[in-house]
Amino acid sequence: DTMRVAFILKSGMLFSIRRDELAQFRLLRLRARRQPYYVRDAKDVLLQLLDIDVEYSADIIEGIYDRLDTFSKQVLGSEMSDDTAGIVLSGIAVEEDLNGRIRRNLMDTRRAVSFLMRVKLLNEQQNDEGRQILRDIDSLDGHTGFVFDKLNFLMDATVGFININQNRIIKIFSVAS
């Protein structure tokens, strides 16, 4: 599940507005405790949170790839029943929704990092980190695009198999009548 988070950077402090605790915040706290000077100021905290979020997005995309591989084997394997096709279509819809939310999250993160860099709020080291985050996002954009294409292919193939199954049933009834 996804959750919207708003950040306010004011007077050297970072405020986050969110409904619940997120794993990204826990991971940042853990890293900060284990590595002295991991974050030195509020802008470091914000950049690290954005970077961790991009890492999480990459992990989720990897999970989508794994599930799509399973769907591909079901769709392109042996004959598929209408019930199996329905389950596959439902799974594809879930993955499409998740991929869309990841894509939107990456877009929001890109806008936030670009804004911080454009208004010159970051020092040179932070700008370097911002550029790396943007490169990571660019890389993930290609993956989310591929996932959308793969989802569309699997959906079309599944619907095609449903049509073939329905045509067989119609032929049986035509011959019987």
For each predicted feature, which ranges?
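Peripheral, non-transmembrane regulatory/ligand-interaction domains of membrane transport proteins
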Residues: 1-125, 131-143, 172-175
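A conserved cytosolic signaling coiled-coil/coupling helix that links sensory/transmembrane modules
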Residues: 96, 100, 155-159, 163
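Generic hydrophobic alpha-helical scaffold/packing signal
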Residues: 134, 155-158, 167-170
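Two-component histidine phosphotransfer core
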Residues: 145-153
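Bilayer-spanning, highly hydrophobic alpha-helical transmembrane segments
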Residues: 165-177
